[in-house]
Amino acid sequence: MAGRLLSVENIDVYYGEFQALFGVSLEVYEGEVVALVGANGAGKTTTLKTISGLLRPRRGRIVWEGQDITSVPAYQRAELGIVHVPEGRGIFPYLTVYENLVVAAYTRRARERFEESLEMVYELFPRLRERKRQLAGTMSGGEQQMLAIARALIQRPRLLMLDEPSLGLAPKLAREVVYLARRLRDEYGITVLLVEQNVRLSLKVADRAYVLETGRVVREGPAGELEKDPEIRRAYLGI
């Protein structure tokens, strides 16, 4: 098995006095696509925010390649290669497509290989090359999502965390965006941690998955096995 990139070890996370995560643990190995699935409010987005450094756990650890990074600020985690595409895209609507990509290259690892990364994202998303002088806020929802992912790729991620990448997209485009996770792994060697509202689709794309309910990991295993599990099928797949 490839080396372990990330370990989340028994974390408790709060918003004020409200506890959102209860002893959550998970692992991500290099070259995997790992899915976090669960109902709205289960704690999936909170888990990603904690890994990226936007939230600090009150208990437990975040370990990256064997090093405890629990106290490392978010901007330094980006330098390590931990890159987060948040729900809602997070682009700059009044900048052009190209300017959005330039601004994304704020880490040293991104600046050093910007031109190479730019060609990579233009190959993945030819529409962005065509519209590089267009204001980002005037593009369609699907194009904005492409740009959000492209901005993350400019940062040369080793772990790319995608939070609800298909949200608000038409079904065909949503499927293409989610399957992009597998393409990034297969063609570019990028490890992906995926949160996706379409549980059926995310289990088809992922190698392994964790199921969260009310802030706790209640199931984990190979995605194909979870997809066939009667309880998962009944609770999340409507079967």
What are these regions (language model features)?
Residues 16, 72, 97-116, 124-129, ...:
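ABC-type ATPase nucleotide-binding domains, specifically the catalytic core motifs of the NBD
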Residues 175-189:
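Helical segment within the ABC ATPase nucleotide-binding domain
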